[in-house]
């Protein structure tokens, strides 16, 4: 599921650099940081992870990355598909889907891959700022 020529990734949750998680360590080996960006969408607090869903009337703040070595992209993004629950086996529920999205940065608009949440966000708190790191800092 790769669109030839798209080697960028937009992340808004635990893959962001502010988390210093194992998942972030993984992507930092294969992807280089391009900068902060935003996409049209809404961000929800699911308790143990954030859920981004497409929406034209709001923005999600995150980080834009580009693969360091293009021939490794399919393998690297496949590993992230597994991490995000895109690739499932029988009787598992797919939590996220990978899709292309317009990313707005300070100087340009580009296309990147994003992991959108596929489940219900009904009754879950909306992260008004669209920025998970800011939201978690304010909750402290």
Q: Can you say where each PLM-predicted feature lies in the sequence?
A:
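Glycine-aromatic micro-motifs
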Residues: 2-140
């Amino acid at each position: 599921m790769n669109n030839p020529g798209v080697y960028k990734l937009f992340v808004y949750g635990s893959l962001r650099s502010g988390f210093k998680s194992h998942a972030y360590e993984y992507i930092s080996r294969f992807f280089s940081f391009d900068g902060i960006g935003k996409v049209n969408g809404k961000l929800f607090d699911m308790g143990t992870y954030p859920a981004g869903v497409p929406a034209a009337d709001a923005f999600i703040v995150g980080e834009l990355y580009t693969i360091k070595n293009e021939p490794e992209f399919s393998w690297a993004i496949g590993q992230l598909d597994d991490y995000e629950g895109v690739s499932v086996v029988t009787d598992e529920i797919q939590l996220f889907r990978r899709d292309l999205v317009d990313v707005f940065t300070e100087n340009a608009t580009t296309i990147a891959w994003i992991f959108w949440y596929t489940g219900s966000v009904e009754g879950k708190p909306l992260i008004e700022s669209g920025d998970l790191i800011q939201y978690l800092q304010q909750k402290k």
